[in-house]
C-alpha cells in the first residue's frame, strides 16, 4: 500500500481540501516530544490535525479512563461509579464493569501511542488504525465504501464507549484479531466539545484498511452520478466562497412569474410541488428530472442563489 496513492485517491473522491485521516500506532520510540494532556487525551488532536505528530504515554495522558482504554494502566477503581453515577452513561456501575470485562482491553506492550496525519508518516507498516473526522456527506461516502465488499450486519459498528474507547480500543482489538468491522464514534458527550459540531469519528482497523485500500476506486466514490452530486456539494462547502442570505429573496420560477420575498426553505418546498407536474414543466425547467426530494431542490437553489440573487 502506497500512502501517496491513497491520498491522491482520497482527495479525488472527497475533494482536494478534504481533511486527511489520522494514523495511530504504538512503538517504544518517541516520535515527538509531547506535553502532558490535561483531561481528555483528544485535546491534543488539534495539533495532529494541523500536521504535528503526537506521542502519548502513561506519563502524558492524565485522564484515568484515557490511560486505561489505551492499555497503559488497569481500570481505576472509580471508573465504574464515575461513568454511571456521575456521567450517567450507564444505569449502574455493575453494567460498566460488565462492559469492560466483555471488552477485554489489551495491555499496551510499547511505551508510546502515536497519532499523525497520514501525509506525515512514511508508510502504513506499524499502523493499527486510520481515524477519519468526517462531516455527514463525507461519512456517507466512507460508510458506502465500507459496505461495497462486505455484507456483514456489523461492517459498520457503533458500540458504546468513551471517545478513546470507540476510536482506539475497539480498533486495536479488531485489528489484532484481523477483523473486518469499522467503527463510528464520538457519540460520547464528553469528547464532543473538542471537535466541530458536524463531525463524528470513523475508524478503520488496518486489518480492514488493507482490503478497502484496493476497493476505493471500484466503489461508488468514482464515476457514479449519485456520488458526483454529493462530491459537488462537499467541494462547494470546502471552498468557503459561498454566502447564502437568510433574509427573504425574490427570483423567477417560470418565465414572467416571480416568487416574491420568500425564505429559501419555502422556495424549495414550492419547487418540490412542481414534481407532480414534471411532464408539463419539462420544457421550462429541464433540471427537474434530476430532483427527487425537497433536499435536492433546496441544494440546487442554494447553489444557484449563491451565484446570482435577484
Q: What do the PLM-derived regions correspond to, one by one?
A:
Residues 2-246:
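Acidic, serine/proline-rich low-complexity intrinsically disordered regions
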Residues 245-310:
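GNAT-family acyltransferases
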Amino acid at each position: 500500500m502506497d500512502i501517496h496513492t491513497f491520498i491522491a485517491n482520497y482527495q479525488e473522491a472527497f475533494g482536494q481540501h478534504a481533511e486527511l485521516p489520522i494514523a495511530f500506532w504504538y512503538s517504544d520510540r518517541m516520535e515527538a516530544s509531547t506535553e502532558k494532556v490535561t483531561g481528555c487525551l483528544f485535546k491534543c488532536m488539534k495539533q495532529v490535525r494541523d500536521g504535528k505528530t503526537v506521542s502519548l504515554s502513561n506519563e502524558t495522558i492524565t485522564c484515568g479512563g484515557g490511560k486505561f482504554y489505551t492499555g497503559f494502566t488497569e481500570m481505576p477503581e472509580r471508573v465504574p461509579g464515575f461513568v454511571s453515577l456521575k456521567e450517567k452513561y450507564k444505569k449502574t456501575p455493575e453494567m460498566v464493569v460488565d462492559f469492560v470485562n466483555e471488552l477485554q482491553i489489551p495491555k499496551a506492550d510499547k511505551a508510546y501511542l502515536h497519532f499523525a496525519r497520514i501525509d506525515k508518516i512514511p508508510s502504513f507498516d506499524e499502523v493499527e488504525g486510520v481515524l477519519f473526522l468526517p462531516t455527514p456527506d463525507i461519512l456517507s461516502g466512507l460508510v458506502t465504501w465500507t459496505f461495497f465488499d462486505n455484507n456483514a450486519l456489523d461492517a459498520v459498528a457503533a458500540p458504546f464507549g468513551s471517545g478513546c474507547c470507540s476510536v482506539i480500543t475497539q480498533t486495536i482489538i479488531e485489528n489484532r484479531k484481523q477483523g473486518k468491522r469499522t467503527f463510528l464514534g464520538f457519540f460520547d458527550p464528553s469528547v464532543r466539545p473538542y471537535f466541530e459540531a458536524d463531525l463524528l469519528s470513523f475508524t478503520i482497523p488496518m486489518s480492514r484498511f488493507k482490503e478497502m485500500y484496493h476497493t476505493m476506486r471500484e466503489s461508488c466514490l468514482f464515476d457514479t452520478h449519485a456520488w458526483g452530486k454529493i462530491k459537488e456539494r462537499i467541494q462547494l462547502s470546502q471552498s468557503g466562497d459561498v454566502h447564502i442570505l437568510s433574509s427573504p429573496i425574490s427570483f423567477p420560477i417560470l418565465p414572467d412569474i416571480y416568487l416574491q420575498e420568500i425564505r429559501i426553505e419555502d422556495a424549495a418546498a414550492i419547487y418540490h410541488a412542481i414534481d407532480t407536474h414534471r411532464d408539463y414543466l419539462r420544457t421550462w425547467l429541464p433540471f427537474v428530472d434530476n430532483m427527487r426530494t425537497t433536499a435536492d431542490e433546496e441544494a440546487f437553489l442554494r447553489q444557484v442563489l449563491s451565484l446570482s440573487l435577484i
